[in-house]
A protein has these predicted regions:
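Active-site neighborhood of phospho(di)ester-bond hydrolases with catalytic His/Asp-centered motifs
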Residues: 1-4, 37-40, 69-71, 95, ...
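Mid-to-C-terminal alpha-helical segments outside catalytic/metal-binding sites
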Residues: 2-8, 18-35, 208-215, 222-254
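Histidine-centered divalent metal-coordination motifs
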Residues: 5-11, 127, 166
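Active-site gating loops and adjacent loop-to-helix segments of metal-dependent hydrolytic enzymes
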Residues: 7-11, 19, 30-37, 63, ...
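Acidic-and-aromatic substrate-binding clefts and catalytic sites of carbohydrate-active enzymes
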Residues: 12-19, 43-50, 72-80, 101-108, ...
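A general structural detector for well-ordered alpha-helical segments in enzyme core domains, enriched
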Residues: 23-27, 52-59, 82-86, 109-113, ...
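Active-site gating/metal-coordination segments in enzymes
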Residues: 34, 47-132
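Catalytic pocket-lining loop regions of alpha/beta-barrel enzymes
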Residues: 93, 106-215
């Protein structure tokens, strides 16, 4: 099983102990995970993602189980070249942050990025949020990703594959039930921000949306890696054998 939501690097708004790739490797081994799609956390709040992408590839090079998931900003000059270079260097997925870039749900450049990723068979990874609004720094002014953003990209083309991390039940349902069955199949979700008992939101979504719509994500080092494992362990007995999707199967590019 692959972790789709892991990061290395510092966080601008609070101290994170040991956000380093060698520590992440040990964390994944402890959790029984085969690897991770890894982003470079500081790049989210930087206008130009190129220096962060360079740092990401360099940091992960000694660790074959850590697959880079760099940022491609589609309103930036020569973004197509950035995408091609990232794929040539082994990117497992491409990250984009439309809320941090001030892009609306129907921004044409985001659609172009989704189409470009779909054409080469690489998932486009979107992050709903990094922290709850109650603890978010006032300097972090980006809003949460909206259901409208996800629906617009899912409708762009049949080749598009989206992985959405950090969503709660409300956002997931608003997105999922606003799509056709074919469009629903283009979107996968992690469940690190979805409640287990006593609310049992995850169990409800396994029953209604389907366990196959979910992938595994920890959000390390921002969140405890044990959270998603605990959510699975605390599912009702009739759902404990339900199989989520291994994210490594989502890309047809090799």
């Amino acid at each position: 099983m692959i972790d789709v939501a892991a990061y290395v690097g510092s966080y601008p708004f609070r101290h994170l102990p040991h956000p380093d790739p060698d520590v992440l490797v040990r964390v994944l081994e402890r959790e029984g995970l085969a690897g991770a799609w890894v982003g470079y956390l500081p790049s989210v709040w930087q206008r130009d993602p190129a220096p962060g992408n360079t740092a990401l590839f360099a940091a992960l090079e000694p660790y074959p189980t850590l697959r880079p998931a760099p940022i491609v900003r589609p309103d930036w000059p020569r973004w197509e070249h950035t995408l091609e270079e990232a794929l040539d260097r082994g990117a497992a997925a491409i990250r984009a942050y439309p809320m941090h870039w001030g892009m609306g749900p129907y921004d044409p450049s985001m659609r172009e990025l989704a189409l470009a990723c779909g054409a080469v068979g690489v998932p486009l990874l979107l992050t709903t949020r990094f922290e709850d609004l109650r603890q978010r720094s006032p300097l972090d002014v980006a809003s949460d990703l909206t259901a409208a953003h996800v629906r617009a990209l899912a409708r762009a083309d049949a080749s598009v594959r989206l992985v959405v991390t950090g969503a709660g039940r409300e956002m997931l349902e608003e997105t999922h039930w606003g799509l056709t069955p074919a469009e629903q199949g283009r979107v996968h979700w992690d469940f690190a921000w979805i409640w287990g008992p006593p609310e049992d939101h995850l169990a409800h979504l396994f029953r209604t949306v389907g366990a196959e719509r979910f992938v595994y994500g920890t959000h390390w080092p921002l969140r405890l890696t044990q959270n998603p494992r605990a959510n699975l362990d605390l599912l009702p007995a009739e759902l404990r054998d339900a199989s989520i999707t291994d994210a490594s199967t989502l890309a047809f590019r090799r």
